Amino acid sequence: MPELPEVETLKNSLKDKLIGLIIENVELKRDNLRYKLSPLLATEILNTNILDVRRRAKYLIIDFNNDYSLIVHLGMNGRFTLQSANYKTQKHDHVIFDLSNGEKLIFNDTRRFGMIYSFKTDLLEKEFFNDLGIEPFSDLLTLEYLKDKLQTKKIPIKNLIMDNRVIVGVGNIYASESLHLARIHPDKSGNDLRDDEIENLIKAIRDVLTKAITAGGTTLKDFVNGDNKPGYFTKQLKVYGREGQSCLSCSSTIIKIKHSGRSTFYCKTCQYS
């Protein structure tokens, strides 16, 4: 599933190319996504000018000059890409946006876990994103904030940092990588973390996400940015997907366990605490 770095990469690849363009036509090809496409999508942003392309958590947001925004979630393997005017429609294309420069913006999702909505811009934070926590790069993510969130939680720290009500966008890959960098065992209870461990974890999350964004995200199978290019952070993964291989820091064997049905990778030597 695309996580924060992948959506940030997608945003970066589309922003400069989309701002200023007009949506000249919206074609709803298949409405059988996780949440059925609303027919209003074809009219609410028609003939509107694109003002901005941004990200909130794992959502891509496109703002228009009629005070509506398009909200896109890629689900498990959705793609949101720019294509030329002579693009031939594919089987799993769900929405096609015709742009004023002749290009097309395509939402394609083979597994249909993605979603795409139009929503009033000024109501997004209050009504659509009201349950989301703090962005990892926000100044609000401090020792005091995270300590307050963790102090009563007797559940594994990996689960806690993947909770979008606490910190947004830290998915399975980057949770394993961040805990390895911070040298914290993924099973350790959140309320058992010392202040210095919490500070190290915040720094590790930011460092890992920054490197992943710089590398264009992680493509394990399906992810591509708006230009159809994969991410290359896969080559920098220290523990994720490396079960049975040697730790790149200490040569111990990488171990795989499960948290809430998700695979977790760690080094028992480096992550002793």
UniProtKB/Swiss-Prot annotation:
Cited Gene3D superfamilies: 1.10.8.50, MutM-like, N-terminal (3.20.190.10)
- FPG-type ZnF: 238-272
> What UniProt keywords are attached to this protein's entry?
DNA damage, DNA repair, DNA-binding, Glycosidase, Hydrolase, Lyase, Metal-binding, Multifunctional enzyme, Zinc, Zinc-finger
Q: Which cofactor does it need?
A: Zn(2+)
* Entries under Pfam families matching the protein: Fapy_DNA_glyco, H2TH, zf-FPG_IleRS
Query: Which catalysed reactions does the entry list for this protein?
Result: Hydrolysis of DNA containing ring-opened 7-methylguanine residues, releasing 2,6-diamino-4-hydroxy-5-(N-methyl)formamidopyrimidine; 2'-deoxyribonucleotide-(2'-deoxyribose 5'-phosphate)-2'-deoxyribonucleotide-DNA = a 3'-end 2'-deoxyribonucleotide-(2,3-dehydro-2,3-deoxyribose 5'-phosphate)-DNA + a 5'-end 5'-phospho-2'-deoxyribonucleoside-DNA + H(+)
Instruction: Name the domain of life.
Output: Bacteria
- InterPro entries with a match to the protein in the record: DNA_glyclase/AP_lyase_DNA-bd, DNA_glyclase_Znf_dom_DNA_BS, Formamido-pyr_DNA_Glyclase, FPG_cat, MutM-like_N-ter, Ribosomal_uS13-like_H2TH, Znf_DNA_glyclase/AP_lyase, Znf_FPG/IleRS
Where is DNA bound in this sequence?
92, 111, 153
Q: How is the cofactor bound?
A: Binds 1 zinc ion per subunit.
GO terms for molecular function, please? 8-oxo-7,8-dihydroguanine DNA N-glycosylase activity; class I DNA-(apurinic or apyrimidinic site) endonuclease activity; damaged DNA binding; zinc ion binding
Looking up NCBIfam families in the UniProt record yields: fpg, PRK01103.1
The entry's function note states: Involved in base excision repair of DNA damaged by oxidation or by mutagenic agents. Acts as a DNA glycosylase that recognizes and removes damaged bases. Has a preference for oxidized purines, such as 7,8-dihydro-8-oxoguanine (8-oxoG). Has AP (apurinic/apyrimidinic) lyase activity and introduces nicks in the DNA strand. Cleaves the DNA backbone by beta-delta elimination to generate a single-strand break at the site of the removed base with both 3'- and 5'-phosphates.
Q: What is this protein called?
A: Formamidopyrimidine-DNA glycosylase
Q: Which organism is it from?
A: Rickettsia peacockii (strain Rustic)
